[in-house]
């Protein structure tokens, strides 16, 4: 059985700074996704089909490489090291099951539903603040402030602190970008330390006087007599902050961009906002995943499809390719019958995104409100895309909203 290192594979470097927008989509589309299922990248290998992606996301012989990255960059102490070691994405086995059993009820669909009225209220406030002609940068006007307000509501934090929460989330999530770790580590460390201090005050206030918020729910969470420690609680809240702000901002912006580029789909959504808002969210997650690659590192030799991946091999699972497999033609269609299981944007297996229900609800309420309030959406300039090395978002999205 050949080693993966012995194979002649197409090479793809998704970290190239200029690989954005149309260039990014063209480069991704050129990679094989049917006959060929594997490519090489600067760090290891990229898996290009859904079945193989599911395997590497679910196998116990591969884990998220957060601890390896910390060692590689010499992160051996301090708040960032503490966060990486205790982050639920880097915890496995029985410890991971225990944490998920404690946190899942607080983020179940029914629990998330109680935040929907606030989501609608925030969308109304942000839309009311648009100029009368409806011309704006959708990212700065709505997509950026909206999830920060939602996460403040979810945490039970003052809404006035939403910009600070966005600032911390923006910096903390850069720990997943190797380039940022090399050039901006001190700023990432500072953001982690500042957020820890901030949430410690919130936790201390909630213990004697719980409210109807996530922190209170996690403080009271209990499974067979077990409760979260203080460090576990603060790291789960940090994880939810990072997963609930930048990712939601980027995915919502892409959803609106896609609807602006496909006016027929916008009119379908306008005709049935309540029925098609969630399918529109699912189609945006499938078509333009803001986490196009999910990393794993082999902790033992892995044999798959007659190939041996040696221990230490880094594998990137391409949700972009997996989400498209078997779909012909590959068009953005919010009325198509797409099985949710086909989408790997939130991952798969035990490390499936803990905040997926919250993210879906945020985007669903935002699109539903816009469809009820806005008659048409059109691009008012060229979108500015970010890089695909971490979260693949939009720096700006100039649009015109006919209110």
PLM regions: where:
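Cytochrome P450
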Residues: 1-403
């Amino acid at each position: 059985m050949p080693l993966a290192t012995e194979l002649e594979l197409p090479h793809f470097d998704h970290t190239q700074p200029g690989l954005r927008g149309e260039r990014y989509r063209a480069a991704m589309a050129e990679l094989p996704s049917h006959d060929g299922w594997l490519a090489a990248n600067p760090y290891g290998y990229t898996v290009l089909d859904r079945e193989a992606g599911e395997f590497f996301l679910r196998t116990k012989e591969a884990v998220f490489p957060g601890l390896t990255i910390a060692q590689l960059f010499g992160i051996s102490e301090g708040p960032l090291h503490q966060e990486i070691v205790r982050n639920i994405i880097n915890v496995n086995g029985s410890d991971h099951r225990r944490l998920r059993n404690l946190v899942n009820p607080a983020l179940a669909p029914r629990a998330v539903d109680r935040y929907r009225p606030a989501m609608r209220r925030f969308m109304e406030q942000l839309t009311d603040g648009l100029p009368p002609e409806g011309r704006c940068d959708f990212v700065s006007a709505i997509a950026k402030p909206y999830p920060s307000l939602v996460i403040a509501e979810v945490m039970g934090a003052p809404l006035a602190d939403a910009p600070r929460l966005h600032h911390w989330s923006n910096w903390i999530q850069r720990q997943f970008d190797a380039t940022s770790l090399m050039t901006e580590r001190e700023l990432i460390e500072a953001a982690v330390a500042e957020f820890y201090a901030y949430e410690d005050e919130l936790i201390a206030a909630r213990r004697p006087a719980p409210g109807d918020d996530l922190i209170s729910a996690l403080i009271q969470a209990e499974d067979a007599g077990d409760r979260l420690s203080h460090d576990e609680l603060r790291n789960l809240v940090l994880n939810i902050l990072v997963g609930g702000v930048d990712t939601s901002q980027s995915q919502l912006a892409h959803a609106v961009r896609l609807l602006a580029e496909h006016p027929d789909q916008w009119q379908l959504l306008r005709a049935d906002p309540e029925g098609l808002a969630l399918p529109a969210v699912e189609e945006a997650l499938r078509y333009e995943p803001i986490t196009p690659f999910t990393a794993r590192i082999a902790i033992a030799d892995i044999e798959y499809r007659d190939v041996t991946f040696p221990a230490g091999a880094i594998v990137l699972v391409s949700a972009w390719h997996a989400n498209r497999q078997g779909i012909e033609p590959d068009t953005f269609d919010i009325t198509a019958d797409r099985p949710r299981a086909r989408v790997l944007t939130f991952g798969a297996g035990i490390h499936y995104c803990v905040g997926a229900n919250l993210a879906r609800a945020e985007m669903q309420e935002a699109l539903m409100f816009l469809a009820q309030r806005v008659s048409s959406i059109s691009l008012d300039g060229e979108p500015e895309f970010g890089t695909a090395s971490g979260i693949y978002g939009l720096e700006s999205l100039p649009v015109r909203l006919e209110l």
